[in-house]
From Swiss-Prot, chains A, B:
Pfam families: URO-D. One of its GO terms (molecular function) is uroporphyrinogen decarboxylase activity. This is Uroporphyrinogen decarboxylase. Homodimer. Belongs to the uroporphyrinogen decarboxylase family. SUPFAM superfamilies: UROD/MetE-like (SSF51726). The keyword RNA-binding does not apply. It comes from Chlorobium luteolum (strain DSM 273 / BCRC 81028 / 2530). The lineage of its organism: Bacteria, Pseudomonadati, Chlorobiota, Chlorobiia, Chlorobiales.
Length: 351, 351
């Protein structure tokens, strides 16, 4: 049914003619076409207006030729749906009020009806699927519980996660109660996204690397596993990608959540990751996003290196080319276009 | 000659009766005694006034009972000595002017006479050694070339290192020219610190984890090796610690610089690091600094875990207990004191 299903085939580790590519934050500020829409509307309104969210979701498919679309939204819509007031000033910072720091604060958070409180995301997915007309798959996503927990407890972004860690270390039961509550919403939310038409799900654990291995095992991984298993129980054919950025020492345990793909930051050579994980999951990544500041020759050389480091494909292997984190707002779109075209061409030799 | 030489013995992997402990930023804002001095003087003036630098350097030795002192200073004194204007507002941010972005900018930077431009650090070391009166060893330090390069090129702190990476990817020769110039000063500077009395040297590569493995191999490691070898050539008995925070995938290559100890962030279980490195270097680290926000029981449990994870000592092993990064300014000093006392007592069972 999909005209280009390479992305899903790679996630399922089925034979592909070449490596598919999409990039995190591909619907974003680096595109003048995105900025034109943002001039007329603020960030959260854009997330909440399905027609506009659909439009910016499809922009990189049409303008850049990526092999997958990802629904335009923000991980913090989950916090908002649970009853927090969320302010996002895209260039400046994030504020959530009130910060969640006591049992009473946790009790006040609701477990919302996803169809009700996050219906606008589901509407945007349905509309995008329709307009995409099966050109490429559509990715749904959520932040992971630990990352959303840090925003809730800190009341915004954070350097050292002081309040989040204080709760974990002084009131671990309370921390788990909040994490469980968030995780329950995430599970419902990602399943509802699949129901609305999302072809794959990515769980973003952006602040994963702030935790020690054991803290990650206690406060992050079990919830990710819960979310992955929630999707798998209802939709066994829908691939799930877990992106626990820079958790390079516990890749194997991330794969053990039952996900189909492990997303990598650029801190590890993808060859090493493949050596550790074998071909039991697909790997997604992992070029340094700042390489897109480089010359065309440098961009091609670095992309070629990622493909070469991943190496030859087998009947069980899967690789989705991506950056190791989001594309930066001041990148020249021509450089992304060049990357996409180069990866499409160059990767064929490894398949 | 030293009354307590455990820190140096651990770095040299000689038998110790227990594990020595110091913590990064131990002379700092969490101590009311430090804040009392800072109320009367700004940060850089404190660095440049040997009597005051000596006083805050010794505070944690007397108040906390740590097994080593580290000279109070800042990594950016090297940038300043090379001709940049450096402003440090401890709670707000760092500004270096002008940012170094062209060949002409690089040419204008000087390779200073360390005795002249950084004489105040050497004076502070001499004075501190005298007043310490051999109670514990004194650590000298420098930022690594890559980290100082990012400050120079960005003109301050940075989130994505856009300008630094642009130079690396578009003008790699120019980047290497700047890195070489900085590295030459670092080598002179750390040797001068030893000459003035420093008993060990630590190289801080604070922003190490912003680089891919290959970029780290090209733009960071060779300069660290140059600095380590500069010390070793002149002072073979003086231990050098390399702290390339969160470079957990290339620990073995860090050890190959010829350093005596590898500093670890808290992102890797120290047992894994020891498995990778064997006992060919001492390991320094690696408790999450935010554990000091925890209850006394939690602090002891986590410290005990680091010691247990490191495991039993052999005739060739070395472990210096430390946090995985600097102690945070809002930590209760009583919690550090508790940690120091606990590590001293608990660690004996592993020796």
């Amino acid at each position: 049914m999909l005209k280009n299903d390479l992305f899903l085939r790679a996630l399922k580790r089925q034979p592909c003619s070449r490596t598919p590519i999409w990039v995190m934050r591909q619907a974003g500020r680096y595109l003048p076409e995105y900025r034109a829409i943002r001039e007329k509307t603020d960030f959260l309104t854009l997330c909440k207006t399905p027609e506009l969210a659909m439009e910016v979701t499809i922009q990189p498919v049409e303008l850049m030729g990526v092999d997958a679309a990802i629904i335009f939204s923000d991980i913090l819509v989950v916090n908002e749906a649970m009853g927090m007031d969320v302010e996002i000033i895209e260039t400046k910072g994030i504020k959530l009020t009130p910060p969640i720091r006591s049992q009473a604060d946790i009790n006040r958070l609701i477990i919302p009806e996803v169809q009700d409180k996050l219906g606008y995301v589901l509407d945007a997915i349905r509309l995008t699927k329709k307009v995409l007309d099966n050109r490429v798959p559509l990715i749904g996503f959520s932040g992971a519980a630990w990352t959303l927990f840090t925003y809730a407890v800190e009341g915004g972004g954070s350097k050292n996660y002081a309040f989040a860690k204080k709760m974990m270390y002084r009131e671990p039961k309370m921390a788990h109660m909040l994490l469980s509550k968030i995780s329950a919403v995430i599970s419902e939310y990602v399943c509802a996204q699949v129901e609305a038409g999302a072809d794959a799900i990515q769980i973003f654990d952006s602040w994963a690397s702030a935790l020690s291995e054991d803290d990650y095992r206690e406060f992050a991984l079990p919830y990710i596993k819960e979310n992955v298993q929630a999707v798998k129980a209802k939709y066994p054919d829908v691939p799930v990608i877990v992106f626990s950025k820079d958790c390079n020492t516990i890749l194997s345990e991330i794969a053990d959540t039952g996900c189909d793909a492990v997303g990598l930051g650029w801190g590890i050579d993808i060859k090493k990751a493949r050596t550790i994980l074998g071909d039991r999951v697909c790997l997604q990544g992992n070029m340094d996003p700042t390489v897109l500041y480089g010359t065309p020759e440098k961009i091609k050389a670095e992309a070629a290196k990622v493909l070469r480091q991943f190496g030859q494909h087998t009947a069980q292997s899967g690789h989705v080319f991506n950056l190791g984190h989001g594309i930066l707002p001041d990148v020249d779109p021509a450089n992304l276009k060049l990357l996409v075209e180069f990866v499409k061409e160059e990767s064929a030799k490894y398949h």
